[in-house]
Amino acid sequence: MKTFLILVLLAIVATTATTAVRFPVPQLQPQNPSQQQPQEQVPLVQQQQFLGQQQPFPPQQPYPQPQPFPSQLPYLQLQPFPQPQLPYSQPQPFRPQQPYPQPQPQYSQPQQPISQQQQQQQQQQQQQQQQQQILQQILQQQLIPCMDVVLQQHNIAHGRSQVLQQSTYQLLQELCCQHLWQIPEQSQCQAIHNVVHAIILHQQQKQQQQPSSQVSFQQPLQQYPLGQGSFRPSQQNPQAQGSVQPQQLPQFEEIRNLALQTLPAMCNVYIPPYCTIAPFGIFGTN
């Protein structure tokens, strides 16, 4: 290749030399012909020198280095493009239609709170029953002073002599108010009804023991020592003795009105209006 390039360059220089010799000839025609010949030979020698100097052009050999253009082969590495086609087949798991039956148990889940509500209602009912039982126990033991206070007022209203001394009566008032304050407000009306109910049943028991005698409210439910404030709660449950008979309803209304006038004012307790008109037995006293 080098020799071929050298030969080509020599041929090119030869042709250029001949052409260079030809062109200056017509320019030198007006001059003497003897002077033209040496001028023609001088450039030939110089041109040969130029040829020797121009021979270094072969350093153009590094140009074949661009042959690495076959580096286009890496483009063949782009063949992985068909690989992404595989994920397109993967979306076939769109069968998640199966989870749609799963939400069905969710519809059954809201039904569970319904059972919880029922349990809460049952618990509330049990709590209410327990409160009623506790209230009844309190009434049996703690509200006896209130019963005696109402009986004392009943005797005074009917012009009977006071059975209890003033000091004992004042102590009963204090005890009655203390126990009445411990009862929740929503149960105070029931407490007063139970007080009246206990008085009626107590008198009914006395009437059964003395059928020939009329019902009398002169004696208190408990006998208190004169001048002393100690008392013993009744061991018997007055509510278990029976229920108020229809003929005793007027007596119940009379005592209830008296109790509603005496106890709230004495203890500064608020009693709702419906307590004065509520029919007997609505609070489960019978």
Curated annotation (Swiss-Prot):
Residues 56-71, 93-104 have a biased composition (Pro residues). Residues 72-92, 105-120 have a biased composition (Low complexity). Residues 1-20 form the signal peptide. Residues 51-120 are annotated as: Disordered. GO terms for molecular function: nutrient reservoir activity. Substrate of transglutaminase. The keyword Signal applies. Pfam families: Gliadin. The keyword rRNA-binding does not apply. Keywords: Allergen, Repeat, Seed storage protein, Signal, Storage protein. Belongs to the gliadin/glutenin family. The alpha/beta-gliadins can be divided into 5 homology classes. Sequence divergence between the classes is due to single base substitutions and to duplications or deletions within or near direct repeats. There are more than a 100 copies of the gene for alpha/beta-gliadin per haploid genome. Gliadin is the major seed storage protein in wheat. This is Alpha/beta-gliadin.
